[in-house]
Amino acid sequence: LRAFFFSPHTWCIMAPSNDAAKDGQMNATTTCGIPRLKNIEQVSEGWINKYILTYELPDGTDYVYESTSRKKLEAYRAGLMANARGEAPRVDAVCIVGETREGTLLMIREFRYPLNSWCVAFPAGLKEPNESIRECVDRELREETGYRLRSDVDEPVRLLPQAGFSSTGLTDEAIQIVFAQVEKAGDAQPEENELIAPFQLPLSDVRRFLDENTTLIGTRAQLILEVFAARAER
């Protein structure tokens, strides 16, 4: 029996000692170390790039792992090294939790090609290289929904303290969740291949929506909506 536990920079294996195993006790010996990234091989290139990562585990054995990223090889390598140093991740995209003055959440149904289906989500999009978070939020709102940041609020955006990773078993994509006060600005202007239907969800209806929705839904949307539902039920 072996157990694994982690700190930000340490990887540990905990195994029962021989004497403990004889006695049926859980006294254990612990070996700690850090997996070492030995090699990154790019095996396909495109909008999504695929990589083979070779690690040396603390016990000296090699471990090969497949991953994907929108970043090209050198940018991907630099990002992995920055992660290992404990640096804050560079924001790749934003997820916008927009609330209107009418007490509704701004949501979308978007056709997601990897799913071959419509999916419920919050408005979101990739950040341009020289774009601020606020600029990205306002642009994505206008493009996907026809909404904008409210002009009558001094600070219409609130960022979570750090960007979070969208799917840590697959990719390095880091997403900044932004809570925003939004208002209608005009017509949406999505790209030709973007099929997006914005809708407003009253805060009082969030629990019923979660219980009754049958359209596919993103995990972020599920979790955030659950928080709003629980808050409304207090």
Kindly label every feature range from the protein language model.
Residues F4-F6:
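Aromatic (phenylalanine/tyrosine) cluster motif
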Residues A15, D19-A21, N27-I34, N39, ...:
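Nudix hydrolase/Nudix homology domain
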Residues D19, G24-Y51, E56-T61, K72, ...:
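Alpha-helical and coiled-coil interaction segments, frequently adjacent to or embedded
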Residues E41-S44, R85-A88, T168-G169:
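Short Gly/Pro-enriched turn/cap motifs at secondary-structure boundaries
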Residues W47-C95, R101:
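Acidic, metal-coordinating catalytic segment for phosphate/diphosphate chemistry
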Residues N83-R139:
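Conserved Nudix-box catalytic region and its N-terminal flanking loop in Nudix hydrolases
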Residues R90-D92, E99-E102, R112-P114, R142, ...:
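Active-site segment of metal-dependent pyrophosphate-handling enzymes
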